[in-house]
């Protein structure tokens, strides 16, 4: 049985949190809510917020449990359409039904992993419990939730597989390089350098920072990500022990049928291999609500994060307030605004030029700027279609 340490206050960097093989990564919960609020939320009672958050928690768990049913329906539809072809055309592809059967086996395997993940997350938070599932049975999940879940499976590729190494090198290495440059071990005690990684996803960037000896805390809002990162960070100690089939949902742009059903192994490293005395934790909740203590962080590292805001200026304001004087903000990512064109959602879509002007008006000093850092995001490396982002990398400093 692994033992847990008490989680640090969600709005503060962890202090002197020892980490060894028998100590789990601490997960503490702030306010997560039922969905991302459109602008300033209209506050209900605390009881209403707790109820909505509890419902959302179980709704996401239900999506994990419903995955197999949803995906089998998708494959069955494909088979029905194939069987509707003239018999002479079906005979041209005798291997096609066999391929669908292979996909079904992959679905069943993915479902086993997803059930393992959620079976371990009921009591994952140090400071919050969500009771028991009031419904008690698996219900159909929304298309939105199933898309989020399929996207989460691809996050395992990006963060914790050998296949995702090239993508991590493109996205994470430039950030880590700037951290090392600004906080060299010759002049800093890394354990005293508090680094925050908002939008931590499955936690690999934050983990890599902690591996260097820095005191690091990841923050994530999505239960899909939180359940999965808890599983990897706290339940996976054997390299490449687990297998997933992340590409079986992609029925287009496959060069070969085998490409669709190829597996990935995870984790490619032992997440428990952090150095003795490491200070690493995760918080769950809205970045802007959880982090309210002024002048608390030496460094904030954001990767593919700032375009998740309804209003990116709110993010800039929060970062300005919580950074220590002399602290730095490192950002890498595109501006694919998540709430653009969504009905009833506030979405302020600024150009990089506008964001840069706002950042400078707050008082940040620009130290590094690269406007064409080429990267992908959860890319299928064998797909016939790939998206590439020309990301912006900047480093700004809050004056002393």
Swiss-Prot record:
List of residues binding S-adenosyl-L-methionine: 155, 158, 199, 220, 286-287, 303, 315
One MF term in the entry's GO annotations: S-adenosylmethionine-dependent methyltransferase activity
One GO CC term on file: nucleus
Residue ranges of the region described as Disordered: 1-51
Top-level taxon in the UniProt lineage: Eukaryota
Signal sequence annotation: none
Location of the protein in the cell: Cytoplasm, Cytosol; Nucleus
Recorded domain comment: The Gly-Xaa-Gly-Xaa-Gly (GXGXG) motif binds the adenosyl part of S-adenosyl-L-methionine.
Known partners and oligomeric status: Homodimer. Each monomer accommodates one molecule of carnosine in its active pocket, precisely anchoring the histidine imidazole ring such that only N1 is exposed and deprotonated for methylation.
Name of the featured protein: Carnosine N-methyltransferase
Species, as recorded: Mus musculus
Species lineage: Eukaryota, Metazoa, Chordata, Craniata, Vertebrata
């Amino acid at each position: 049985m692994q033992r847990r340490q008490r989680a640090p206050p969600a709005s503060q960097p962890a202090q002197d949190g020892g980490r060894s093989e028998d100590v789990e990564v601490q997960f503490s919960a702030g306010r997560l809510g039922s969905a991302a609020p459109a602008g300033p939320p209209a506050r209900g009672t605390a009881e209403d917020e707790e109820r909505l958050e509890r419902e959302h928690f179980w709704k996401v768990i239900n999506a994990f449990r419903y995955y197999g049913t949803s995906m089998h329906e998708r494959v069955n539809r494909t088979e029905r359409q194939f069987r509707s072809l003239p018999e002479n055309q079906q005979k041209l592809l005798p291997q096609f039904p066999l391929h669908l059967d292979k996909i079904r086996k992959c679905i069943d395997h993915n479902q086993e992993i997803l059930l393992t993940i959620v079976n371990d997350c009921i009591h994952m938070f140090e400071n919050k419990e969500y009771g028991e599932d009031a419904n008690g049975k698996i219900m159909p999940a929304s298309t939105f939730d199933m898309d989020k879940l399929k996207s989460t499976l691809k996050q395992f590729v990006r963060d914790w597989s050998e296949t995702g190494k090239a993508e991590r090198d493109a996205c994470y290495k430039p950030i880590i390089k700037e951290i090392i440059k600004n906080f060299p071990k010759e002049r800093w005690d890394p354990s005293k350098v508090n680094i925050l990684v908002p939008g931590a996803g499955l936690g690999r960037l934050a983990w890599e920072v902690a591996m260097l000896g820095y005191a690091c805390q990841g923050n994530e809002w999505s239960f899909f990500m939180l359940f999965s990162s808890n599983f990897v960070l706290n339940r996976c100690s054997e390299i490449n022990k687990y297998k997933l089939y992340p590409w079986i949902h992609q029925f287009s742009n496959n060069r070969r049928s085998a490409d669709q059903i190829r597996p990935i192994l995870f984790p490619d490293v032992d997440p428990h291999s952090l150095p003795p005395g490491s200070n690493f934790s995760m918080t769950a909740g809205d970045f802007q609500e959880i982090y309210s203590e002024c002048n608390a962080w030496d460094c904030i590292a954001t990767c593919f994060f700032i375009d998740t805001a309804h209003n990116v200026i709110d993010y800039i304001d929060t970062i300005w307030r919580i950074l220590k004087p002399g602290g730095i903000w490192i950002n890498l990512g595109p501006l694919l605004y998540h709430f653009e064109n969504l009905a009833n959602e506030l979405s302020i879509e600024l150009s990089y030029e506008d964001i840069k002007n706002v950042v400078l008006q707050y008082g940040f000093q620009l130290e590094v700027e690269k406007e064409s850092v080429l990267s992908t995001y959860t890319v299928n490396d064998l797909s016939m279609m790939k998206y590439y982002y020309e990301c912006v990398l900047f480093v700004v400093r809050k004056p002393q």
